[in-house]
Structures are given as structure tokens and as C-alpha cells.
A protein has these predicted regions:
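Alpha-helical transmembrane segments
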Residues: 33-46, 107
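Short juxtamembrane and helix-loop transition motifs at transmembrane-helix boundaries
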Residues: 1-2, 34-36, 60-71
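Alpha-helical transmembrane segments and their membrane-interface exit regions
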Residues: 45-50, 106-116
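N-terminal signal-anchor/start-transfer transmembrane helix
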Residues: 14-24, 43-60
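Membrane-water interface at the C-terminal end of transmembrane alpha helices
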Residues: 21-24, 110-131
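Membrane-helix boundary connector in multi-pass membrane proteins
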Residues: 85-107, 115
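Hydrophobic alpha-helical membrane segments
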Residues: 71-92
């Protein structure tokens, strides 16, 4: 079996914010953890918007119209939530509250890097080099 460096690079980049949050759970706490609250709140807002636009809005439309015919897809703010959460994790290293909230936001942010990897994993044109 041949190692696919594109997939290894994709896993490394897309899950680095998750690894940072897990590392932050075990790191010693800094006194400046409060500086992470603003980027974390902004990242949570963007993540919530992405979750709403990806899952909740189509579900509500389907309930009202009994199908998705005529539904207009609306894009959220991809990657911005992940960047804000990463900044929050860097500012609040060692804070278990910031790390746990960051993991939660990374989970719900469907426009973030981890979700990009999950959604595109089966796309051979993206991850496999041309033969």
C-alpha cells in the first residue's frame, strides 16, 4: 500500500486546531486565559451560523414544503470560525474551559477545516494524484 502524502497533509492541517485544543486541556494554565473569550465567542457565532445554514435551515424548509425543491443554498463563512477558535486556543492555552468550548465549536462549525476533510475525503480528484 502506497502512502498518500496529500491525505497525510490534509489530516495534519485540518485536525491541527483539534490537536491544539486537546493539548491545551493538559497544558499548565496561563493567567491571560480571559483574552481568549472574544475570539472564542466570535468563532462560536460563526460556527452556529454555519451549522444553521448547513443543517437546520434545509430541515425547516423540508418540513414546510415537504421537499427541497426550490431550496436555495446559502453559504456560511467557511474557515473563519476555525481561525477564530485557533486564535482563542492560542490565547487561552491551559484553560480547560476554553479548550472544551473550542472543541465544541470545532465540532459544530460545519464550515471549518475538520469538516472540510470529512466532507471531501471520498473525492478522489482532490486527494489522489493524477495517474
Amino acid at each position: 500500500m502506497r502512502l498518500n502524502f496529500r491525505r497525510v497533509l490534509g489530516i495534519t492541517i485540518c485536525f491541527s486546531p483539534v490537536a491544539l485544543a486537546v493539548w491545551s486541556l493538559f497544558a499548565p494554565r496561563r493567567p491571560t486565559w480571559w483574552a481568549a473569550l472574544i475570539p472564542l465567542a466570535l468563532g462560536a457565532s460563526i460556527g452556529s451560523l454555519n451549522l444553521y445554514l448547513s443543517w437546520i435551515r434545509p430541515w425547516i424548509y423540508r418540513l414546510r414544503n415537504h421537499s427541497l425543491e426550490g431550496y436555495r443554498h446559502a453559504s456560511g463563512a467557511p474557515v473563519i470560525g476555525t481561525v477564530l477558535v485557533t486564535l482563542a486556543l492560542l490565547a487561552g492555552v491551559g484553560s480547560k474551559l476554553i479548550a472544551a468550548a473550542g472543541l465544541l465549536v470545532l465540532t459544530i462549525d460545519t464550515g471549518g477545516l475538520p469538516w472540510f476533510l470529512v466532507q471531501t475525503w471520498g473525492d478522489k480528484s482532490l486527494w489522489n494524484p493524477a495517474a
